[in-house]
Amino acid sequence: MLLQLREAIGKQKMLIVSPECVTVYQGVPDYSADTPGQAYNYFVNVIRLADQAIDLYQPQAYNNWYDVPGGTVNYLKDVYLNWRNYKGIMDWMKPIENFEGVAGRKLMMGVLASTSAGGAAYYYQPSVLQEFISWLSENKYELNGFMIWDSHWDSLNGNAISNIATQ
């Protein structure tokens, strides 16, 4: 379906996938795309089949369960490493077999603009977001950018998140 959509819209338009509450997670089985009730890893097969058609992925770095607390730099690192299919921060994790991961140039991390924009436990203080950006730079990891949910809450929060994300 995504390949046909790409063909129909051509290369002049971008195809951006923003999976809500869907995650790539090395700690669970690799489900098929039609397995009902599975938010974890069913998207791996979508990526395998249609990555060449997709310009950007914007996974939420919130509202998804990982083995580290939300709102922390380790949560951001874990989301990033899992979507890239690099070894996660948990010692027992292993990359998903036969899966290249999402290229950093295609990955945008979805973050909350304030505690009011979603689950407060998943809000990243500007200092945490800055620490994550520094970690990316230190490790020479590529990231296309951030998707901030949403601009209304960011404005009410003094543009704290967009100011950090655009540095």
Task: Describe these PLM feature segments.
Residues 1-167:
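Secreted glycan hydrolases and related glycan-binding modules that recognize and/or cleave
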